[in-house]
């Protein structure tokens, strides 16, 4: 099993408790389905209640399992077209190669990335290269795992300026029901998170972040409680007195409803609170 996480997935359990089950200030619909020929369709639409702006996207995915190939096409209402071709676990177990391209017909702008990642039980590493003739940017990351401990490094190098534009470190520990994650970004941004699965129904998370040279410390607490196999409640609060509440209900297999609200605790009577509504449909 190649289960070492990527750098971006470090601390993911804590992030999920804070982010999943909420959709403040918008009405959102997600639809996923699969054709008889094996083509996967995914579409989503958002309407923001404060601005009235609406957006949407469509994604199709087709897998050729015998050759380890996956073809993905994307389109959104900004008229941006994306194509992704990936080859996984064929040249070597745990190796994934990807070509990701973007085309904007209105402006003729084209861009792309070459991606490579390699995962094993005790490490994972990867690199992305922008396809830009003026000077590509090279991204790289690596994560080492040993007896539950995780250490990661992430960087980006701007070849046009010949300097590092990103320099991040992370250290964490992962167990079955507990995760600890700390990180330092560019030597100026510091953060950490703790995830605890109390039991089969309750998950909790704590998040802390601050920036060097600033007194602005960000702190938050979040929890998720499963009432039953169909219903869950979510709540979170931060040091800015913003309170988030979420309710998720599986109405029937493949149909999920999410209600959420963001309350400004400092200005409770002044209004400005946000609500959200979401539907997820899968067939």
From Swiss-Prot:
Give the InterPro entries listed for this entry. Porin_dom_sf, Porin_Euk, Porin_Euk/Tom40
Task: Give the sites modified to Phosphothreonine.
Answer: 4
- Specify whether Transport is a keyword of the entry: yes
Q: Which residues carry this modification: N6-acetyllysine?
A: 12, 15, 20, 90, 266
Catalysis: reaction(s): chloride(in) = chloride(out); K(+)(in) = K(+)(out)
Tree of life domain: Eukaryota
The post-translation modification note in this UniProt entry reads: Ubiquitinated by PRKN during mitophagy, leading to its degradation and enhancement of mitophagy. Deubiquitinated by USP30.
Q: Which GO terms describe its molecular function?
A: nucleotide binding; porin activity; voltage-gated monoatomic anion channel activity
- Subunit (UniProt): Interacts with ARMC12 in a TBC1D21-dependent manner. Interacts with MISFA.
Residues found modified as N-acetylcysteine: 2
The record describes the protein's role as:
Non-selective voltage-gated ion channel that mediates the transport of anions and cations through the mitochondrion outer membrane and plasma membrane. Forms a high-conducting channel with a stable open state and a voltage-induced closure with a mild preference for anions over cations. Involved in male fertility and sperm mitochondrial sheath formation.
Q: Which CDD domains match?
A: Porin3_VDAC
Its family remark reads: Belongs to the eukaryotic mitochondrial porin family.
Cross-link annotation Glycyl lysine isopeptide (Lys-Gly) (interchain with G-Cter in ubiquitin), location: 53, 109-110, 266
**Designated name of the protein:** Non-selective voltage-gated ion channel VDAC3
Q: Which GO cellular component terms are attached?
A: membrane; mitochondrial outer membrane; pore complex
What GO biological process terms does the UniProt entry carry, in alphabetical order? Answer: sperm mitochondrial sheath assembly; spermatogenesis
Which residues are reported to carry the modification Phosphoserine? 241
User: What does the entry note on its domains?
Assistant: Consists mainly of a membrane-spanning beta-barrel formed by 19 beta-strands.
Short name of one Pfam family: Porin_3
Key word 4Fe-4S present: no
